Amino acid sequence: MTDSPVLALAKDLISRQSVTPEDAGCQDLMIERLKALGFEIEVMVFEDTTNFWARRGNEAPLFAFAGHTDVVPAGKLEQWDTPPFEPTIIDGYLHGRGAADMKGSLAAMVVAVERFIAEHPDHKGSIGFLITSDEEGPFINGTVRVVEALMERGENIDMCIVGEPSSTEIVGDVVKNGRRGSITGDLTVKGTQGHVAYPHLANNPVHASLLAIHELATTEWDKGNDYFPPTSFQIPNVSAGTGASNVIPGEFNVQFNLRFSTELNNDTIVQRVTETLDKHDLNYDLHWTFNGDPFLTDTGALLDAVVAAVAEVNNTKPALLTTGGTSDGRFIARMGGQVVELGPVNATIHKVNECVKVDDLEKLTDMYENTLKHLLAK
């Protein structure tokens, strides 16, 4: 039996070992298909990262699909039931690293556009593709750099679907219409090292910090809103001491992260954390990493089109959620357009035996094509 177009392309993409930041020829596959449809292609290589921007048309609105060809490492190969880069179908599921995150989505995007253009060669507006090989890694030379380049020349995306695996039980049951912001603080509290038997000759930075850290951890940063839960403060890493039980440490290192709603911004968080630390009279250094602002698409033509497109396939509307981690949608949202995420079921992403239901690839392709019809068909 011959594979369907979306399954064949998904297999071809999965077979390429594109572990971040490698692309391994995945983008060339997509570019070849898009060139045949009349897309203008711009390859953008930044450091070790391969990206491309493709566009068909010069009119507004500019609708784009966004995604990544890179995947996380496979891990221990002996834990996989099948080789991770040899796409295999078992009981109706396509297995392989990247099947759900997110080579299945990429295949669905390309095939959906092929079908749409075949029916609507003179469609309204413009269609774009923003594809990177640096989403699973440090995300410094990928989508963010392409967005910066586009914005510098005034080429802003009006509407964008990011193909991240948004679904939970069945494909399309959840559409992410926003994401929380993320900011990380690396705090070093300085004390004076000494012998534990002579605490009066030392200054223990762990003891000095505990009240301040407790206050930060128990602060109500906000109450959230209709779209976002309250901001979360979490401490993932702490370290101090030499490993010896008789030495008071000279430094105490605390790393913390806040996932924040649209009720806050980076500047407000920095100010409130600094005020808390200063109130406790600590001697400290604090380095911030700004991972991304929150974004929200609560209304608009894109959201209406995606909800309708999903309902036409599933006979039920998707839930609109902002849960989960960050995505490249946060960079695209800087352009001021509407951004949502729609992709496969996320139950196996980043795990051994990652897989996607073959039928879900067909449904996702239909959802993407229906969205294009709602937005750009004449």
Curated annotation (Swiss-Prot):
Is Zinc there in the keyword field?
A: yes
Report which reactions are catalysed by this protein. Answer: N-succinyl-(2S,6S)-2,6-diaminopimelate + H2O = (2S,6S)-2,6-diaminopimelate + succinate
- What Gene Ontology terms describe what this protein does at the molecular function level? acetylornithine deacetylase activity; cobalt ion binding; succinyl-diaminopimelate desuccinylase activity; zinc ion binding
Tell me its EC number(s), please. 3.5.1.18
Q: Which residues bind Zn(2+) 2?
A: 101, 136, 350
Which InterPro entries does the record cross-reference, listed alphabetically?
ArgE/DapE_CS (IPR001261), Bact_exopeptidase_dim_dom (IPR036264), DapE_proteobac (IPR005941), Peptidase_M20 (IPR002933), Peptidase_M20_dimer (IPR011650), Peptidase_M20A (IPR050072)
Q: Which cofactor does it need?
A: Zn(2+); Co(2+)
Entry-linked PROSITE patterns: ARGE_DAPE_CPG2_2
- Hydrolase as UniProt keyword: yes
Name the residues that span the membrane: none
| This protein's UniProt keywords | Amino-acid biosynthesis, Cobalt, Diaminopimelate biosynthesis, Hydrolase, Lysine biosynthesis, Metal-binding, Zinc
**Active site annotation, chain numbering:** 70, 135
**Pfam families reported for this sequence:** M20_dimer, Peptidase_M20
Q: Can you state the subunit structure given in the record?
A: Homodimer.
Role this protein plays: Catalyzes the hydrolysis of N-succinyl-L,L-diaminopimelic acid (SDAP), forming succinate and LL-2,6-diaminopimelate (DAP), an intermediate involved in the bacterial biosynthesis of lysine and meso-diaminopimelic acid, an essential component of bacterial cell walls.
Q: Which NCBIfam families does the record associate with it? A: dapE_proteo, PRK13009.1
Annotated positions binding Zn(2+) 1: 68, 101, 164
Q: How is the cofactor bound?
A: Binds 2 Zn(2+) or Co(2+) ions per subunit.
Q: Which GO terms describe its biological process?
A: diaminopimelate biosynthetic process; L-arginine biosynthetic process; lysine biosynthetic process via diaminopimelate
What is the name of the protein in this document?
Succinyl-diaminopimelate desuccinylase
Q: In which pathway does it act?
A: Amino-acid biosynthesis; L-lysine biosynthesis via DAP pathway; LL-2,6-diaminopimelate from (S)-tetrahydrodipicolinate (succinylase route): step 3/3
The family this protein is said to belong to: Belongs to the peptidase M20A family. DapE subfamily.
Q: Which domain of life is it from?
A: Bacteria
The organism of origin for this protein: Vibrio parahaemolyticus serotype O3:K6 (strain RIMD 2210633)
